Structure formats: C-alpha cells, structure tokens
Amino acid sequence: MARLGLLLLLLLALPPHFSSVSWPDTAQGTMANLILTALEKATLFLEDRLPTINLDGVVGFQVLEVQLRGVQEKWAHKPLLQPLSMRAGQMANTLSALLQKSIFYLKQSDPTYLREFQPSIQPGFWKLPNDWTRTNASLVYPWLEPLDSFSEESSDVCLVQLLGTGTDSSQPCRLSNFCRTLMTKAGCSGYSLSHQLLFFLWARMQGCTEGLFLQSQHYMDIFCANMMELNHRAEAVGYAYPTQDLFMENIMFCGMAGFSDFYKLRWLEAILSWQNPQVGCFGRPDTKGEPSEVPHQQGILRRVRRREKLFADGCSCHNTATAVAALGGFLYILAEYHPDNGDAHPEYYPNHGDPYSSSQSPASNYQDGAAGPDVQRTGRPLSVS
C-alpha cells in the first residue's frame, strides 16, 4: 500500500509534458508494471486451479485476454514500450491456451451452463470500446425497488434468450415481454442492476440492433450512472469485503461499455491491494475483524449473482474474474492514453474534481464498428475524481 500511495503522489506531480522522459521510467510506466505483475500472478492462479475454475471465472479471463491483445497492439510499435508489449502478448498467449483447455473441464463440471453461456467465452465475442464517455449523475435513481422478483434464474433466462442458446433452437437477439420488462425495470440495484447492464452490453456484443436494442445505449447510460453511485457507496464504507466483488464487476462491465470515469486511480490502488500476493487470487481477506456484512446492503449483495466457486483458502472465482477484467481495463485505457500515442497525458483531478459536464450525453462505439449516438467524445479518461 505504501508503494501504491507513493505512485499516486507521483502521478499527481507529473508535469503536463514529459516526452523527454523514458515512458517505462515514469509513474505511468510503474503503474503499468504493477498491473501487469498483478495480472501475471492471477494467471498463475488460473493455471494452478484450472480444473476447478467455473465458467464465471473463465469469462473474466476471456475479457482480460481481449484487453491484453489491445494493449499489445497499441504498444508493439513503440520502441520504449516493446518490453511491456511483449509481457502483455505473452500473457495473452498463455491465457488463450488455458481458456481453450478450460472448456474440457467445464463440459465435465457443468455442461448445461456451458452450453447456455459458451458464446461469452468464445474468441471474438468481447469487443473493446473504441471511444469513451462518462456517466451522467442526473440519471441516478431517486429510489430503489425491492430485489425479490429479480432472481438469478430470471436473469439466466433472459441472457440465454439473448444469446440464442436455449433448447428451443431460437435465434440470438430474441426478447420476450418478460425479459423486456425485467431488463428495463427502473430502480434495481446490486447484482440485479449489473445484470441489466450486462444484458444490453451482450446485446451490443452480439450485434442486436432492432426493436428495444435500438435503445441499448440509453439503458447503458442509466445503468452505469447508477452503478457508479453504488461504487461511490462501496468506497464510502471502506470497500468492506462483501462490496468488493460488485464494485469490481461494475468497473468490468461499465468499463467495457466505454465509461471511462470508472477508471479512477484511487480505485486501481484499492483493487491492487486486495490481491492475495502468494496465491494471486482475489477473495475473502485474511484480516481479522473485517466486517462480514454491510448494513442495509446484505440483500443487494447476495442476490442475482452468478454461480460462485469459493476455495478453502478464501480465493473466489467470481472475485478474481471481476478483478482481472477490471485491472485489464485500467491497463488498456493507460495504453490508449499516454504521450507516445500523440495525446496529451491524462489530466488528474484530485478532490473529486470533474472536468466534464454532467449533462453530456454518453455514448460508446466499439471496434467492430457498431454505431452509437453521434455525440461529443471525451479525450482524457483516467482521473482520480
């Protein structure tokens, strides 16, 4: 933590222009090295426990592989960054082999779940955002609905309909009235909210553009604004253990949806501090006296959560999956916005400053060319706000 705190101070002290400094020797280079090291440890954890990793764990590492490929591509032709590019590429290659091997074990442990959600772990499914925006605080709900009606089973039904992987041999992008109502329901929180976002995010990845999916960006704007609010609440209670998984899931999903303000330096610092340094996983902390529940949030944190796999040493498949995908997003946005790309270095705004208008209409385009609304884009995504 002391090293991370020093890193944050170094980032805040950087001058606006430092192109004469060797990039790997700057604070950004140090930060990239810290992230890569954490991800390498997590990859070793995946390799060590591959026969027992569930599908949710595989999804997180699949997202990470895509992010690492993006980082490798951006750094490959930068002489100063080639060592970092090679590390990212080598890790991506390792993950590719491990993820292919994981399908063998998943067919044995949970064949039905694999059949239903296999598209989410297939190469080419996840696509990186090409443009970035920020959440709009005016879209935060003034109220929260009870979560009893939003079960994991209901979420699965709608996601399977969307993917077209049900037993009825339906086509992708299918939408029943039940799922239309459930996935656009206002006032949801916790995992219900993140799965609403996941539904429209997967619709974008699948190329669903008709009917309700014409409004996918509208709903992602709403959901990520509220997921940002929940992350601020998690931060306010000191990231108590039960909140960490949802906190990282929100960064993973909204980051992939193109919302740059989820990539805050202080949140990166927090996530890096949660890794088990010996095993490489994320999960229940060793610290005695850690609160086991967060008042008024127990129901939110326990509902609509993908199948969990906990190990005896406290490692969690789901926590580790969301952590690596969140960290991969931090690395990707760092690779996209640094001086060698010709951009001014990202501005850092302490004391919760916000350089962007909260009324700005969010939108996001993806590298596959799926179009979003034509609005002004933001250009400096990494901040400490």
UniProtKB/Swiss-Prot annotation:
The keyword Lipid biosynthesis does not apply. Belongs to the UPF0764 family. Residues 344-385 are annotated as: Disordered. It comes from the Eukaryota. Its main location: secreted. Predominantly expressed in thyroid tissue. One of its GO terms (cellular component) is cytosol. It comes from Mus musculus (Mouse). It is found in: Secreted. Glycosylated. Keywords: Glycoprotein, Secreted, Signal. Residues 1-20 form the signal peptide. Coiled coil: none annotated. Residues 356-367 have a biased composition (Polar residues). This is UPF0764 protein C16orf89 homolog. InterPro entries: DUF4735 (IPR031751). One of its GO terms (molecular function) is protein homodimerization activity. Homodimer. It holds the Pfam family DUF4735.
